[in-house]
A protein has these predicted regions:
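PLP-dependent enzyme catalytic core of the Aspartate aminotransferase-like
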Residues: 123, 160-205
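Structured helix-beta-strand junction loops
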Residues: 93-94, 137, 191
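Short beta-strand-to-loop capping motifs
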Residues: 22, 115-119, 197-199
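Alpha-helical membrane insertion/targeting regions
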Residues: 85-88, 125, 148, 152-153, ...
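Active-site region of PLP-dependent enzymes
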Residues: 1-112
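Conserved PLP-binding catalytic core of the aspartate aminotransferase-like
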Residues: 100-177
């Protein structure tokens, strides 16, 4: 299964919502049932006419907006790629700013253009101050992602009755402690500056 978001920052958007695609008819029928209030779908009937589900049906107006945007998706993706290549070639000349490197023989659609910021090359200027300076020049940017295992949701799950029934206290503690070892993730989250995808649709000059 593949999952796609149509939230308002995405390449094609309906404001909110998303889509699931796949080549497993049984799984797709289950997804269809779940998003349609648990009603039977295809070969999936649950324990009767209704099974567990909710109303996640997309409205026709949203679908029409999305279908119209498909016509320009390929062209806009190519524009993003060319502008990202141009931007990377120029940013590589600036010490302290490192564009994202793509694996060989891969292509990016650039939902986000990330770069690594090295404060040491800017006399210790904090990343937040660097981003404020970019915004002052009309360049939208953000710190993008943070370490989501610190936002309370994980602790809530670990401390829940369900988790504590399934796993021993020792195992849950070991899992929580293991998160302190994700130093690479912490480095990326603290040094990345992200440019939004719509910036790559603009003119170079």
């Amino acid at each position: 299964l593949g999952c796609f978001s149509f939230q308002n920052s995405k390449h094609i958007t309906s404001g909110e919502g998303g889509a699931i695609t796949g080549n497993n008819e049984d799984l797709l029928d289950r997804c269809n049932s779940f998003h349609n209030c648990g009603r039977a779908a295809g070969s999936f009937h649950g324990q009767g006419y209704f099974t567990r589900g909710s109303n996640y049906r997309m409205q026709h107006f949203q679908a029409a907006m999305l279908l119209q945007q498909l016509d320009k998706l390929v062209k806009e993706t190519e524009v993003r790629r060319k502008n990202a290549d141009y931007l990377s070639a120029n940013l590589q000349q600036i010490r302290g700013v490192t564009p994202a490197r793509l694996p060989k023989d891969s292509r990016a659609v650039w939902h986000l253009y990330p770069l690594r910021y090295d404060a040491a090359q800017f006399s210790g200027l904090p990343r937040a101050a660097f981003m404020r300076a970019l915004r002052a020049e009309g360049v939208p940017c953000s710190g993008v992602y943070h370490e989501q295992y610190y936002d309370g949701l994980l602790n809530e799950a670990i401390e829940s009755h369900g988790f504590q029934r399934l796993f021993s206290r020792e195992r849950l503690k070991a899992y929580r402690d293991s998160l302190q070892e994700l130093t690479g993730n912490q480095l990326v989250c603290s040094t990345t500056v992200g440019l939004p995808q719509n910036l790559l649709l603009g003119q170079r000059r």
